[in-house]
Structures are given as C-alpha cells and as structure tokens.
C-alpha cells in the first residue's frame, strides 16, 4: 500500500502516528488492517485526544436519572381528550339551547315547530327501520345470481391476490 507522502515525511514517522492515515486509494484498508492484525492503531484511536474529548462531552453533569416514579404526572396521567371534547360538546349544546330559549329574535312558536318536525322525523326513521327489520324485502333471483357470480369471479381472479 502506498502511504501518502508530503506532510507525513516532514512531521513524523508512519509508525508514530496516533491518527490512522487516510489516502485516496487506501483509506479504508488502513483502518481494516488495524482492526484485523495490528491492533496498535485501533487502540491508539480509542485512547487519543479526540476520544477523550468525546467521552467528556458525553458525560452528563450530576447524577444519572433513574426510572421515573409513577407518582410523577406525565402523559399517562393526562385526561382523555375525547372525554373532554364530549364534555365541551354537551356544554355547547346546552349553551345553544339556552341562547335559543332566551333570544327574543327567534319566536318561541318557531322553535317549537322545529323541535316538533325533528321529533316526527326521528319517529318516522325509527318506524321505517323497525318495518324493514320485521319484513326485509326479498331480493329477486337475477340479483342473487349476479351477486354470487360476481363474488365467484373475484375469488378465482388472479387479481384477487
């Protein structure tokens, strides 16, 4: 392997270097050689001034924090946001009803008419649902055959996978 020349010859000998020499062609091989056979360079790199500076920066001042006790409030002790939003929605509905009841701009008879129409609509929906559940409409034979054929063709299709 060709060692880079120039600065190396002027400053120090190749064996005395504490930093692995990186050349354009053999940058990785020097590090691998140190890791495989000559452990001197690898150990020097672990004990060099850069490694010491990195270790000192990694140390935290003060004691190492331990596990967080369960009595400390955190994310688990936060209230459920859905429950809070449901509470806000109930309050909003109550405030709206109070506004409508107390507002002189909307006549009371008009409000009662809206409530009566809403009540009739809900009762009609419930009656239609009960009638459908009691006697569901029969599907004709052609629609049943089409549904079965479509389901079978989808199950056998290579696109189903």
Curated annotation (Swiss-Prot):
This protein's domain notes: The C-terminal portion of EID2B is required for nuclear localization.
Cell location: Nucleus
Cited PANTHER family: EP300-INTERACTING INHIBITOR OF DIFFERENTIATION 2-RELATED, EP300-INTERACTING INHIBITOR OF DIFFERENTIATION 2B
GO annotation, cellular component aspect: nucleoplasm; nucleus
Function of the molecule: Acts as a repressor of MYOD-dependent transcription, glucocorticoid receptor-dependent transcription, and muscle differentiation.
InterPro entries: EID
Record's protein name: EP300-interacting inhibitor of differentiation 2B
A GO molecular function held by the record: transcription corepressor activity
Gene: EID2B
Region (Disordered): 1-26, 54-77
Quaternary structure and interacting proteins, as annotated: Homodimer and heterodimer with EID2. Interacts with HDAC1 and HDAC2.
GO biological-process terms attached to the record: cell differentiation; muscle organ development; negative regulation of DNA-templated transcription; negative regulation of myoblast differentiation
Keyword line: Developmental protein, Differentiation, Myogenesis, Nucleus, Repressor, Transcription, Transcription regulation
Main subcellular localisation: nucleus
